[in-house]
UniProtKB/Swiss-Prot annotation:
This is Release factor glutamine methyltransferase. Its EC number is 2.1.1.297. It is an enzyme of class 2 (transferase). S-adenosyl-L-methionine binds at G117, T118, G119, C120, G121, D140, W168, N182. Methylates the class 1 translation termination release factors RF1/PrfA and RF2/PrfB on the glutamine residue of the universally conserved GGQ motif. Gene3D superfamilies: DNA helicase RuvA subunit, C-terminal domain, Vaccinia Virus protein VP39.
Length: 277
């Protein structure tokens, strides 16, 4: 079977996903080791029997709801190709808002930045790609996730980012200009209404107690001990949590509190500045 016919067949099997043609091309790229642009321009290429069988196996996995990123073990974030696994959340485009906000507040060429709950390292590595002089630390309490983050840093050859184990601030011994975090913020009640593909991701990185606010409050409460005077805390949160998150920033004496929307127009990131010493 040639690529063109296989894509047509695959689109029918994946008719329930948002972009079946795009995902079919990604799977072809993964199996044939050709770029997606090459596949698009060379649709008469014949698949081997081995490739055909493997592609059908992958299509079956995708039809059951498994995210394409886990199938091809890769996800693009901030134009970086990142390895992902079942131990890491899949980076979302909306999290790039967190990176953009951090970039807008970094004033020093030698800034120190902490990424709490780094997962595959997406936020830390995006920031590391901007300025090699910045000192960036990413922490996580999952050793398996940290292994993926280190693989990504090595693959990208970034020398200005370090990943190590810490349960939030437990093993942090220094202060930072910027602290960023995409923590668990989904409540146990909410999770049941999500699409089924979310259940392939590590629930410990998604669900938080106290209606999704437990980890957020923990970070806001304790981060002031790890920020320099004038430092910024930036947190991603649920689209209906802005008011409560802003309240927590005020409760723990942050200033210049602002919230920002994601690409879909939903409240997604809140930031605050430390003024007290």
């Amino acid at each position: 079977m040639n690529i063109k016919k296989w894509i047509k067949k695959s689109i029918q099997k994946l008719s329930h996903v948002d972009n079946p043609k795009f995902e079919s091309e990604l799977l072809l790229s993964y199996v044939t080791k050709h770029t997606r642009s090459f596949i698009i321009s060379s649709d008469e290429i014949q698949l081997t029997e081995k490739q055909y069988k493997y592609l059908n196996h992958l299509i079956h996995r995708r039809s059951l709801g498994e995210p394409i990123a886990y199938i091809i073990k890769e996800k693009e974030f901030w134009s970086l190709s990142l390895c992902v696994s079942y131990d890491t959340l899949i980076p979302r485009p909306d999290t790039e808002i967190l990176v953009e906000r951090a970039l807008s507040k970094i004033k020093s060429n030698s800034a120190c930045i902490l990424d709490l709950g780094t997962g595959c390292g997406a936020i830390a590595l995006a920031l590391a790609s901007i300025n090699s002089n910045w000192n960036i630390i990413g922490i996580d309490k999952s050793e398996n996730a940290l292994a993926i983050a280190r693989i990504n840093a090595s693959k990208l050859n970034f020398k200005n980012v370090t990943f190590f184990f810490s349960d939030w601030f437990l093993n942090i011994k220094k202060k930072f200009n910027i602290i960023v975090s995409n923590p668990p913020y989904v409540s146990k009640k909410e999770i049941k209404f999500f699409k089924k593909d979310i259940f392939f991701e590590p629930l410990s990185a998604l669900i938080s107690d106290n209606n999704g606010l437990s980890d957020i409050e923990n970070i806001i409460k304790n981060s002031k001990h790890y920020l320099f005077y004038g430092g910024w805390l930036m947190i991603e949160h649920g689209w209906r949590q802005k008011v409560k998150v802003q309240y927590l920033f005020k409760k723990y004496n942050f200033h210049e509190i602002e919230s920002y929307q994601d690409y879909g127009g939903n409240d997604r990131v809140t930031i605050g500045k430390k003024y007290d010493k």
